[in-house]
Amino acid sequence: MLEADDYQSPLSVPLVKPETHSTQFIQPLQPQIQPDGDYNLAPKVSVFYGRTAELATLNQWIQVNRCQLIMVLGMGGMGKTSLIAKLMAGFTNSTDLSSSEFKYVIWRFLRSASLSLHHAPTVEETLTDLIHILSHQQAVDLPKFPDQLISKLMQYLHQTRCLLVLDNLESILQWGGGGYYRPGFEGYGQLIRTIGESTHKSCLIIISREPPIAFSVLEKKANSVKLLILKGLLPEDGLKIFQSEGIDETQAEWQILHNDYGGNPLILKIVITTIHFLFSGKIDLFLAQGITVFGDIYDLLDQQFQRLSDLEKTVIYSLAIHRQPLFMPELLNKIIPPVTSQKLLGTLESLKLRSLIECNSDGFTVQNDLTEYVTSQFES
């Protein structure tokens, strides 16, 4: 199954021991407990295009506003992990580590590309792992219950400025469950809420394709809680990916590709590979096929679509089949069985948060690639 660049392979780099330097960059959990902090793996920041505004916003929130909880949302392939890895590089690549913004920078994957979809560390495993790292392996006889472990972790987050990252949060959320946690993983909700509401020196960044339940309420209650919805690359930044791969295109050809794929970096890279492999690097030959969704692009969209509720799927179907913007009253008339305006409004908000629909003065629409994916369901 295709994994987006949010799950890219990590790059090994030397660990700085805490007794000699002030910043520790810790190995991602995959998802076993890390026994010590003497070596580490960090997500690799490869060639990076654009995202200047997003990086500036994140730096403002973290360094100036001292936000305690940040969620980065976006469709698969948008480069959420790459964005945060680039951000973290600014905190860890300084030659003068004593001046680093954080003493600890710790990244945890709640699911890795090599593991099954439903395999994720329990909140007890994650909390115990973090406490061992922050205590220099000195913490013993730790409590077993999540609320007690959270209280223990908060002591360290209050004493020391740490940057924590939880990646792939959607892997512990229910499919079609409106942001509800899978049974046995509800403790992550308590952890997120506590970090967002408590007073401390640290910051937790959550990376996910969809938000957990009640996050929007938490964001509205606390000024230290922020949400960044990652959209596609700007046209000029996406174009740089094609130019770096030696593909020549006219402005009209590039505009078609950008409109079809919404600036999704991973999908653009998949298209580049196909153009080289099947069409000798000629973009016009690829466009002449009139096919937007195929192979790994189909798999990527299918992963996202299959997580939706039945009503969310119905809304996407209605918009895709109509192929023109629709307002809420028009959507209400098309949905069978009928639903209330309140339920539809909540569904539209959920889809908008996940960047699966777009809205403007003309109404609600879906992107071209998602439209083709949906219509292909009726042809198969």
Predicted regions and their residues:
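Active-site signature of alpha/beta-hydrolase-fold catalytic machinery across serine-
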Residues: K86, G90, I270, S318
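Alpha-helix C-caps/helix-loop-beta hinges
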Residues: V105, L353-R354
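Post-nucleotide-binding-loop coupling segment downstream of the phosphate-binding loop, primarily
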Residues: K44-F48, A56-Q63, C67-G177
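A structural signal for repeat-array scaffolds
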Residues: L87, F91, S216, I336-P337, ...
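Loop-to-helix "switch" segment enriched in basic
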Residues: H258, P265-V315, L351, T365, ...
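Alpha-helical sensor/transducer elements of the RecA-like P-loop NTPase core
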Residues: R51-A53, S82-L83, P121-I131, G176-T274, ...
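Amphipathic alpha-helical scaffolds
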Residues: G74, L83-I84, L173, G177-L191, ...
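Conserved adenine-nucleotide phosphate-binding loops and their immediately adjacent elements
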Residues: A4-Q60
